[in-house]
Amino acid sequence: DSIRLSLLTCAPGEEIYSLFGHTAIRYENPSQGIDIVFNYGLFSFNTPNFIFRFSLGETDYQLGVTDYEHFAAEYAFYGRSVWQQTLNLTDEEKTELIQLLQENYRPENRVYRYNFFYDNCATRPRDKIEESIAGKVVYPTEPQDGSRTFRDIVHQYCKGHPWARFGIDLCIGSEADQPITQRQMMFAPFYLMDAFDGAQISTDTYSRPLVKTNELIIDVTPEPDESGWMPTPLQCSLLLFILTAAATIYGIRRRTGLWGIDLVLFGMAGIVGCVLAFLALFSQHPAVSSNFLLLVFHPGQLLFLPYIVYCVRKGKKCWYLTLNLVVLTLFIVLFPAIPQRFDFAVVPLALVLLIRSASNLIVTSKKK
């Protein structure tokens, strides 16, 4: 049988949406001149209200089909290697998988609601392959259930991209720190590839490997990053803390409130808080609903900003800043015990808001 079906795993790219790699299914039928790729990762930034729908977690992806030649040329052009795992399927299973993919490619079926952790370009091919098999796919025991969290895997693939890691860490909450099963780890294409490598197709009478061969079919060396040095989130937050601390000491010595600094700092914190609150309350994205960073960045920082500025300008004690000081102090003290992993750059940012809140108490008490 000359028909061959394979799982393709593509190396990560430089864009944030490609940092985790990509998965597709290749279908080869030389007798009919067919060599195509089924790709569940198609989306368009030009979709109406794309940014708003994305923030709501209502991004629609779709299954696309392209010639393998064009698929390979694109990944080679962008310096992304591709691995091919030829599937060890019977003729009946091959026919079933082809029919499932063709049915899924019908216009009324090809669009699906994307979910970063649970329904993406890696989980869809896995599910279709499993559905086509007359038996059960038994995956290897490593990595064990509970040995990873979603955040662990995010950090693994954001290595070398500190701002992407920082941004994702801001948005995902404590749910991302819960241990996950091996199957859940397969949202990441290379975890899926490793699982397929050791998987067996088990029936009542025999078992066979899921994968016949695994080969590197596009071998390219990525271009070196020539973007130059860029400060990390931690370096930026530490610099902001030092500058804010120096300005605050100056203001306390002069017994004056620096309302312009408070306007910028609490305004920025409030804007970030509005984004986090929106994600927590309205978004369908996974793992964003229980975010303890809302103790630091929340809409109240923006809502009470006019009152904060008024009190600081008039040299009056601000009850909101007093409450803010208490909450931020508790956050810093209890930081190690909070059931959520934070990027450490958050600590200097929290301290910035804390010392600005404390400065109001100190300055107003000195004026009495």
Roles of regions detected by a PLM:
Residues 22, 35, 84-86, 122, ...:
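Extracellular structured ligand-interaction cores
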